[in-house]
């Protein structure tokens, strides 16, 4: 069974059907040929919850042997499931990935961590500030420098300077994290 067929199976079926497929030898650890995306990363970007809870499907995939910290190849930006869930602002998936051992400061192709992505994309959204607070409470670093010599603190201070100058909205201010 190919990757796209597996992803369709995940989208269309319930856990019982997925368990049956696994017992019949279906390999859920496959990746797509283009960017080495795995089913956990693909699911983290979509977060379907029509037939089952996201936590149930993540647990199923992890029990199938999927590496929670698997990253896409360079073509895919070396993103892990945690990066993708953060960028999609899906708190439930972010939280469950962290609870199950996702590396909190995993880096993508530019050296950016999930917290860096969250801060960079934050524009006052309630679910994103919850993700930022969760990442910080779980030990995500504000000080790690990416491959372009920028840290989360740098981004927070740059946005804060824009707020002080009247260029950015006040609700974007995250400088309270630096205290």
PLM segments and residue spans:
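Ankyrin-repeat-protein effector appendages
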Residues: 1-5, 129-133, 137-143, 147-179
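Ankyrin-repeat boundary/"N-cap" motif
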Residues: 2-6, 31-47, 71-84, 107-120, ...
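Terminal domain-start segments
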Residues: 16-33, 37-45, 64
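Ankyrin repeat domain, specifically the short helix-to-loop turn at the C-terminus of the second helix
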Residues: 19-27, 57-68, 95-103, 131-141, ...
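Alpha-helical adaptor scaffolds
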Residues: 67-75, 79, 83-105
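Conserved binding-pocket/active-site segment within a compact domain
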Residues: 107-123, 127-134, 138-141
């Amino acid at each position: 069974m190919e990757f796209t067929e597996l992803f369709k199976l995940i989208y269309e079926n319930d856990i019982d059907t997925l368990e049956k497929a696994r017992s019949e030898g279906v390999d859920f650890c496959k990746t797509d040929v283009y960017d080495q995306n795995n089913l956990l990363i693909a699911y983290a970007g979509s977060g379907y919850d029509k037939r089952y809870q996201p936590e149930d499907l993540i647990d199923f995939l992890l029990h199938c042997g999927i590496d929670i910290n698997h990253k896409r190849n360079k073509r895919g930006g070396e993103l892990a499931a945690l990066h993708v869930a953060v960028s999609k602002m899906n708190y439930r998936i972010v939280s469950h990935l962290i609870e199950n051992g996702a590396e909190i400061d995993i880096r993508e192709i530019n050296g950016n961590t999930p917290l860096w992505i969250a801060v960079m994309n934050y524009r006052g959204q309630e679910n994103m500030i919850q993700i930022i607070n969760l990442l910080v409470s779980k030990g995500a670093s504000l000080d790690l420098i990416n491959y372009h010599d920028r840290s989360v603190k740098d981004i927070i201070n740059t946005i804060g300077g824009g707020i002080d100058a009247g260029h950015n909205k006040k609700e974007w201010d995250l400088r309270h994290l630096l205290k």
